[in-house]
């Protein structure tokens, strides 16, 4: 009895595609951000000191209020950043649609431009987009989202509320000698990552344009 012929079988190796983002730069960015946030939060003032009623008094004049705000901003800067961030987070979580739109916009900038490998073109629906076209599309999308939707007004109102809370608190807290004797470290704490993050983003943009 004749054996049936053996059918040829071809083993195709799976082609592994490149990651959609530049993984080393992506990890470096978030590692630096996480480290800066931890260092900044470790330098925050005790919250009980922030709400100590014995250190609060009405300012005698506008000049006195501005002087207090300036000194308290240097002393409570990490706490104030946390307060403004909480106000922003509360506003966004109370408007889920705006939160999703903002997350989508930030994700577009990160995954499609900032952390995408420069040698990997962006292909959408079979069409290849250059870096300049991608940047233009993201800039236009940002303008539309910020100025033509409720996201921009929501962020602006939340920032104004947060800044108002900070200014009122700073105007009513009387700085003591501890405030005046303490030297403010340059680029320390929670705000230090802003310069590095801005530099990294600027370098990524300038390298593509």
Curated annotation (Swiss-Prot):
InterPro entries: Prenylated_rab_accept_PRA1 (IPR004895)
Transmembrane as UniProt keyword: yes
Post-translational modification N-acetylalanine, affected residues: 2
Chief location: membrane
GO BP: vesicle-mediated transport
Residues that span the membrane, as ranges: 73-93, 95-115, 133-153, 154-174, 185-205
Name by which UniProt lists this protein: PRA1 family protein B1
Subunit text: Can form homodimer. Interacts with PRA1B2, PRA1B3, PRA1B4, PRA1B5, PRA1B6 and PRA1E.
PANTHER family according to UniProt: PRA1 FAMILY PROTEIN B1 (PTHR19317:SF95), PRENYLATED RAB ACCEPTOR 1-RELATED (PTHR19317)
Pfam hit, one: PRA1
Keyword field contains Transmembrane: yes
Family in the record: Belongs to the PRA1 family.
GO cellular component: cytosol; endoplasmic reticulum; endosome membrane; Golgi apparatus; Golgi trans cisterna
Organism: Arabidopsis thaliana
Membrane topology: Multi-pass membrane protein
Subcellular location(s) per record: Endosome membrane
Signal peptide coordinates: none
Keywords in alphabetical order: Acetylation, Endosome, Membrane, Transmembrane, Transmembrane helix, Transport
Domain of life: Eukaryota
Function: May be involved in both secretory and endocytic intracellular trafficking in the endosomal/prevacuolar compartments.
């Amino acid at each position: 009895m004749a054996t049936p012929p053996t059918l040829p079988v071809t083993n195709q190796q799976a082609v592994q595609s490149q990651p959609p983002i530049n993984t080393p730069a992506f990890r470096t960015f978030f590692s630096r951000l996480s480290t800066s946030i931890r260092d900044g939060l470790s330098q925050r003032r005790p919250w009980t000191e922030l709400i100590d009623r014995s250190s609060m008094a009405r300012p005698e004049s506008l000049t006195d209020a501005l002087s207090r705000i300036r000194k308290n901003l240097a002393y409570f800067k990490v706490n104030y950043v946390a307060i403004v961030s909480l106000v922003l987070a509360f506003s966004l979580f109370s408007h889920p649609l705006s939160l999703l739109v903002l997350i989508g916009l930030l994700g577009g900038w990160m995954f499609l431009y900032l952390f995408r490998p420069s040698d990997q073109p962006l292909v959408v629906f079979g069409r290849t987009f250059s870096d300049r076209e991608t940047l233009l599309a993201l800039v236009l999308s940002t303008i539309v989202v910020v100025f033509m939707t409720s996201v921009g007004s929501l962020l602006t109102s939340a920032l104004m509320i947060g800044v108002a809370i900070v200014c009122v608190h700073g105007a009513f807290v009387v700085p003591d000698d501890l405030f005046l004797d303490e030297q403010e470290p340059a680029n320390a704490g929670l705000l230090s990552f802003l310069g590095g993050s801005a530099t990294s983003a600027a370098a990524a943009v300038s390298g593509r344009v």
